[in-house]
């Protein structure tokens, strides 16, 4: 018995370790809300699954061939009580589960601003093949595959795509949302404490999809201001011409920063007045072209 308890404890420890850095290790209010909805839904479903499994084993044991005390009813066909239990419990469970998820989804509406005494930071996000462009309009800078935010400050993300549909997702901050060409999605997130995280593309988008990841750093306010100053002091300018180079298909792009950015660039990308990227090609249509694995500097 002690060995069994030890095995269970080790298994739980390994599972919890595997959750580190993911949606079950939230860093902000939206991430915690997502984790709560997931855990509550799991508990509600287990309340049905576990008794059902236990009853299946009990039925097999109770009505085994060697048990002569078990009641044998060869002509039994209907029981109102059993029908009531079989139908009412699943219906009530679905209603309860739906209510929990609906309330959680309403509270976690991605368009709803987060309440805070600090002013909200705006970051414009563009999904490219196969990299992420982050524009800080108020600071006049941009980065590729690197998102830096001040800890404890709400962030409003305006998200679009210069290629195919994609999904922007930072697991520890919560709520994945579509990046769509010709449209702008809104998402409000917050990192409560300084930390190093990662973000991903959560929808397949072609050859370089598996490498379409980005670094996420939440830092103290002073460090964020110092980082902004460093970026503004060096690096290239991101305008429509340099964006034309950036939008080309490339994978495993290193972290890149731009000291200045065209203030109308994001609007041009979202409205598609600036030409979008080529998008992933169908099999057999590469025409000899290769996907670049280099960066843009």
Which residues fall in each region the model found?
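Hydrophobic transmembrane signal anchors and adjacent membrane-proximal interface regions, especially
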Residues: 8, 16, 43-47, 120-122
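N-terminal secretory/membrane targeting signals
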Residues: 1-21
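Non-transmembrane, membrane-proximal soluble domains of secreted or membrane proteins
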Residues: 20-37, 63-297
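Membrane-entry segments of alpha-helical transmembrane domains in multi-pass membrane proteins
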Residues: 1-6, 30-51, 85-88
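Generic alpha-helical transmembrane segments of integral inner-membrane proteins
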Residues: 11, 15, 47-54, 88, ...
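Generic alpha-helix structural propensity
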Residues: 42, 51-55, 80, 100
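Membrane-water interface of transmembrane alpha-helices
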Residues: 51-66
